[in-house]
UniProtKB/Swiss-Prot annotation:
GO terms for molecular function: tetrahydrodipicolinate N-acetyltransferase activity. PROSITE patterns: HEXAPEP_TRANSFERASES. Catalyzes the transfer of an acetyl group from acetyl-CoA to tetrahydrodipicolinate. The gene is dapH. Keywords: Acyltransferase, Amino-acid biosynthesis, Diaminopimelate biosynthesis, Lysine biosynthesis, Repeat, Transferase. It catalyses: (S)-2,3,4,5-tetrahydrodipicolinate + acetyl-CoA + H2O = L-2-acetamido-6-oxoheptanedioate + CoA. This is 2,3,4,5-tetrahydropyridine-2,6-dicarboxylate N-acetyltransferase. Pathway: Amino-acid biosynthesis; L-lysine biosynthesis via DAP pathway; LL-2,6-diaminopimelate from (S)-tetrahydrodipicolinate (acetylase route): step 1/3. Belongs to the transferase hexapeptide repeat family. DapH subfamily. InterPro entries: DapH, DapH_N, Hexapep, Hexapep_transf_CS, Trans_hexapeptide_repeat, Trimer_LpxA-like_sf. Its EC number is 2.3.1.89. The keyword Amino-acid biosynthesis applies. It comes from the Bacteria. Pfam families: DapH_N, Hexapep, Hexapep_2.
Length: 236
């Protein structure tokens, strides 16, 4: 079934209707040679095995075959999860360990996603854009090309409370560390948001804003451009 990810109610419906998943990884010390694993993925031999599968099926298997098992250890990292993580194998971008990216996210060529970044469903990240450490992109947030989203910055999502207008960060915008862009705000091209700012309304192109709430303090000039220029080598 297709869902319109531009509509918060459609995203909510997708989450509601999705099959919830509690995957387990289990290390087993025992003889499973004659055990029926059914839909469980089973790898190993010589009394050591690794199992992958859904929680209830794994737990049933362990109980039914307890006489063949000496001991086991279970690893679990989620419970009743509605949305899988994004499959990043074929994405032409740099994605560092520890980034959390949900499915149905678009990431452009040569983008950089740093450790600890959290990117929710429906987000769009443009070519050459960097999402720095521990930054958060809420549902449906849109970042244009060559944006820098600073460490710890937040671009609010528009899933709950629902809104039809997502946050939009246009091309060549720099957002400083720990800044917050509130729901539905658009930041115009080439603008700069100072670190720690709270942006509560749309920002025009080519300006610098600072404060809480953020206010325009100057237009972007050559000095600003020099201080906020991006490094292409980080995107290779």
């Amino acid at each position: 079934m297709n869902y319109d990810l531009t509509n918060p109610y459609e995203i909510a419906r997708y989450i509601k209707e999705s099959k919830k998943s509690t995957p387990l990884k289990v290390y087993v010390d025992g003889n499973l040679t004659n055990c029926n694993v059914n839909n469980i993925e089973c790898y190993g031999e010589n009394n050591f095995y690794v199992l992958f599968g859904e929680s209830q099926e794994i737990l049933n298997f362990l109980d039914e075959n307890k006489d063949s098992i000496n001991k086991y250890r279970i690893e679990q990292d989620r419970r009743n999860s509605a949305i899988p993580m994004l499959d990043t194998k074929n994405i032409d971008a740099r994605i560092e360990p520890g980034a959390i990216i949900r499915d149905m996210v678009s990431i452009g060529k040569n983008a950089v996603i740093m450790m600890g970044a959290v990117i929710n469903i429906g987000c769009e990240i443009g070519e050459g854009t960097m999402v720095d450490m521990n930054a958060v992109l809420g549902a449906r947030a849109k970042l244009g090309k060559n944006v820098h989203l600073g460490a710890g910055a937040v671009v609010a999502g528009v899933l709950e409370p629902p809104s039809k207008s997502p946050c939009v960060i246009e091309d060549n915008v720099l957002i400083g560390a720990n800044a917050v862009i509130l729901e539905g705000v658009r930041v115009g091209k080439n603008s700069v948001v100072a670190a720690g700012s709270v942006v509560v309304e749309d920002i025009p192109e080519n300006v610098v804003v600072a404060g809480s709430p953020a206010k325009i303090i100057k237009t972007v000039d050559d000095k600003t451009k020099d201080k906020t220029k991006l490094m292409d080598d980080l995107r290779k």
